[in-house]
């Protein structure tokens, strides 16, 4: 039995690691001309998100998730376009999926819209997950999505 225990502690012990890949949501800051957060006023504009040919109204897909009913797996809970903690979000999307030039259009209900493009890719380096993400707002590369509404 001592020999078996020693054999189980070899160099390949990382082979049995099971990774839980976190899901993600796209965070959209909505500010006024002075840079103040106005997300709380967004609902009155009745914004919609257009994604993969489908239209999602604000908060129409919000789900009350029963934590006890969830599995141990990190399944993406897609809620469409929603507000939470003073921010506007779209998602959740699976962190293990690849998105290349994915396009999300926010229609603001006042005749204006913004186009968000993004890339999301999970790559493995030295047996560790690395996430590569990039975002564009109306054709301009950005580090975070900040939309000014007056």
Predicted regions and their residues:
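Tryptophan-paired
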Residues: 41, 45-105
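Surface-exposed molecular-recognition determinants
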Residues: 27-30, 59
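Beta-strand-rich extracellular modules
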Residues: 31, 107-111
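Glycine-rich, aromatic-bearing surface loops/beta-hairpins
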Residues: 112-150
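A general secondary-structure signal for short beta-strands and their flanking turns/coil
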Residues: 21-23, 101, 142
């Amino acid at each position: 039995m001592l020999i078996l225990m020693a054999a189980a502690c070899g160099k390949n012990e990382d082979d049995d690691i099971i990774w839980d890949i976190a899901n993600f949501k796209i965070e959209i800051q909505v500010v006024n001309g002075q840079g103040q957060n106005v997300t709380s006023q967004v609902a009155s504009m009745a914004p919609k998100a257009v994604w993969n040919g489908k239209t999602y109204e604000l908060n129409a897909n919000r789900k009350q998730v029963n934590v006890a009913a969830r599995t141990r797996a990190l399944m993406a809970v897609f809620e469409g376009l929603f507000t939470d903690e003073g921010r506007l979000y779209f998602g959740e999307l699976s962190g293990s999926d690849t998105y290349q030039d994915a396009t999300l259009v926010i229609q603001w209900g006042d005749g204006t819209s913004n186009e968000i493009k993004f890339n999301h890719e999970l790559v493995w380096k030295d047996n560790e997950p690395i996430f590569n993400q990039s975002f564009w707002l109306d054709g301009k590369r950005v580090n975070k999505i900040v939309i000014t509404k007056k």
